[in-house]
């Protein structure tokens, strides 16, 4: 921090199917970083996995196809080498902390978190165990079920073991939702009613992952809340918010989330009885701990008409876009976007010390 500012590398883009969502999220993070406090260094992770130095100009992040690459030094405690297109490599200014805004595989699954640990550089956000456990919906379900938390009934599907449609219908009823086990943002998710739907869902799902989940349909409201951990380990759980997909979308799909501006209605806070909301918040905190998460997560639920609370999933790098729920529920709970960033950085520095 020679300049007196904290040098924070913001990773965005990435190799996953959520690449474009990451760019939207990182743009908001860059806008929220206080320039008086932070020297933000955006680094674009290409779809091939290269780390290229980027720039934030006029409110937009550049996405270079080539240029200077940034390479962390193992055990370097923030040292990094820049490899330019031409000329000799040189040592970059010391990195104080990495802030990954990478959704899905290779960013939210413990991979980047492990790289930061090997390089001995602090990282904002969830660490290795929670990231790996939460991203894999199959593993996450097994862990939270073991802890006594309720989830939707499901069947795990691999390329080697694809059950017959009739068997799934008997086990789960109709409709069924097919989803990649290790993707977010509703990428590759399909609502299945017929054998033809099932075959199409299998073909598409296996593009994104080698493991899929078939889940029962639950007629319920979709409710989410945010969890934020301070550097001392105390958890703050936000008020709950509700997502109501438009009638033009049969579920909370990728298009409803990010493409169609009128794809969803977001109600913050959700209109829930106090007792139900308090139970949701308590389950969110428990699930966060059960999966070994730290720092932050968004926890998603179904709430049925008879007020049964069903845990859906946990996202350790929730969307940071204008339409994202995490920051809306935190704001209504009294925590602003810049304050969330500050707390994530403080937590990462404390964990890395």
Swiss-Prot record:
Pathway: Cell wall biogenesis; peptidoglycan biosynthesis. GO terms for molecular function: ATP binding; D-alanine-D-alanine ligase activity; metal ion binding. GO terms for biological process: cell wall organization; peptidoglycan biosynthetic process; regulation of cell shape. Binds 2 magnesium or manganese ions per subunit. ATP binds at residues 169-224. This is D-alanine--D-alanine ligase A. Its EC number is 6.3.2.4. GO terms for cellular component: cytosol. It comes from the Bacteria. Cell wall formation. It is found in: Cytoplasm. Residues 141-346 form the ATP-grasp domain. It catalyses: 2 D-alanine + ATP = D-alanyl-D-alanine + ADP + phosphate + H(+). Keywords: ATP-binding, Cell shape, Cell wall biogenesis/degradation, Cytoplasm, Ligase, Magnesium, Manganese, Metal-binding, Nucleotide-binding, Peptidoglycan synthesis. NCBIfam families: D_ala_D_alaTIGR, PRK01966.1-4. Its cofactor is Mg(2+); Mn(2+). It is an enzyme of class 6 (ligase). Its main location: cytoplasm. Pfam families: Dala_Dala_lig_C, Dala_Dala_lig_N. It comes from Brucella melitensis biotype 1 (strain ATCC 23456 / CCUG 17765 / NCTC 10094 / 16M).
